């Protein structure tokens, strides 16, 4: 684990370290052609009340580390920002969870055990203490840790569920969501496509939905969120493989299916702040949703440039269009109302959408 005070990596030192490791040729050209000191103004995305300055690569990994796919984001009550990434194969450091302060300065890193598997990352206050919940798609576990990385518990597939008795390998959890009573929901998005419910102490309480393409059926339930904006909290599921959103009561009763591929194509996850919900869409954009889950804004929509989902993720930074997203995988509102976006691209990308 690394403590505060370690210097943040500059682009020059980053490139030098990677050259020493013999991998500079594989790096995105952003690190060579970065223009943040050139005086060039960051592009602006959105309109009206949803207008943001788009600052790509706002968070840089510490010296000796190379981002892998940047998958998960959260922020604690003190303002610290947590980034989960898979760790690039060329990285000289192996920590998969990297922590920054509100100004983007490196604080600490931990979690070498999540290398290759860091995916969903959520934070919850329980009593007076905050905890991280990690979904590890490599070890196929949900892991609860302290904010500095000490394990509280690890859970694999629910042995009480007959769906996993013959094929426990089908459990590949992608994200969690939290109910007000302490329960939490696990989306088995890369495994069985079930949505599972657990108590605060990890007891299996049953399934919310099963695989399929009809109402109350899921295909890659990639992320979920308990939405507090209405009269009663609802479980909102990013049914990514079906290119839609579904809502349920907290007990699992299906309420609504929302499909609008003209505006929302491959929802990955959610977070709410005030009356708005942010939704990273793997198909080239970040969406802002209203209380009815209608798209109020499409931010940084790069669909026209990108074409098929993921087809440009392996290209160099020089081939990325400023102000356009490639594959947004997670997004959160920061405490000040700005939005932070993590993208599923090699040698990841963390973009700050700063309110204008």
Q: Language-model features: where?
A:
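N-terminal secretory signal peptides
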Residues: 1-9
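N-terminal export leaders
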Residues: 10-25
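Blade-level signature of beta-propeller repeat domains, shared across WD40, Kelch, NHL, RCC1
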Residues: 327-356
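Conserved beta-propeller blade signature
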Residues: 81-82, 131-133, 184-185, 234-236, ...
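Beta-strand-rich domains and repeat architectures in extracellular enzymes and scaffolds
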Residues: 56-92
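Blade/loop signatures of beta-propeller domains
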Residues: 35-54
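Surface-exposed loop and turn segments in beta-propeller and other repeat-based domains
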Residues: 59-64, 110-114, 153-167, 205-216, ...
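Beta-rich, blade/repeat-based domains predominating
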Residues: 66-78, 114-128, 160-183, 213-234, ...
């Amino acid at each position: 684990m690394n403590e505060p005070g370690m210097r943040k990596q500059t682009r020059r030192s980053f490139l030098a370290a990677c050259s020493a490791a013999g991998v500079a040729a594989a790096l995105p050209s952003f690190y060579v052609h970065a223009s943040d000191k050139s005086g060039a103004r960051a592009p602006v995305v959105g309109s009206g009340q949803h207008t943001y300055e788009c600052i790509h690569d706002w968070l840089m990994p510490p010296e000796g580390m190379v981002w892998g796919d940047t998958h998960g984001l959260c922020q604690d009550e003190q303002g610290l920002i947590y980034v989960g990434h898979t760790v690039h194969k060329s990285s000289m450091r192996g920590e998969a969870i990297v922590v920054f302060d509100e100004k983007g300065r490196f604080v600490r890193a931990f979690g070498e055990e999540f290398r290759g598997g860091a995916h969903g990352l959520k934070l919850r206050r329980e009593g007076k203490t905050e905890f991280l919940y990690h979904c590890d798609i490599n070890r196929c576990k949900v892991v609860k840790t302290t904010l500095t990385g000490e394990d509280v518990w690890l859970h694999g597939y629910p042995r009480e569920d007959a769906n996993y008795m013959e094929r426990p390998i089908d459990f590949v959890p992608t994200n969690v969501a939290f109910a007000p009573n302490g329960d939490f929901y696990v989306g088995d998005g890369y495994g069985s496509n079930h949505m599972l419910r657990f108590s605060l102490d990890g007891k299996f309480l049953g399934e919310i939905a099963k695989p399929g393409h009809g109402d109350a059926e899921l295909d890659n339930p990639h992320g979920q969120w308990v939405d507090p904006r209405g009269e009663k909290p609802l479980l909102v599921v990013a049914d990514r493989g079906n290119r839609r959103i579904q809502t349920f009561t907290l007990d699992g009763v299906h309420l609504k299916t929302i499909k609008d591929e003209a505006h929302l194509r491959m929802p990955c996850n959610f977070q709410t702040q005030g009356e708005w919900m942010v939704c990273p869409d793997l198909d080239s954009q970040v969406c802002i949703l209203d209380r009815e889950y209608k798209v109020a804004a499409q931010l940084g929509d790069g669909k026209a440039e990108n074409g098929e989902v993921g087809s440009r993720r392996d290209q160099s930074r020089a081939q990325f269009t400023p102000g356009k997203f490639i594959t947004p995988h997670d997004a959160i509102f920061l405490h000040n109302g700005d939005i932070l976006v993590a993208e599923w691209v090699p040698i990841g990308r963390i973009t700050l959408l700063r309110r204008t």
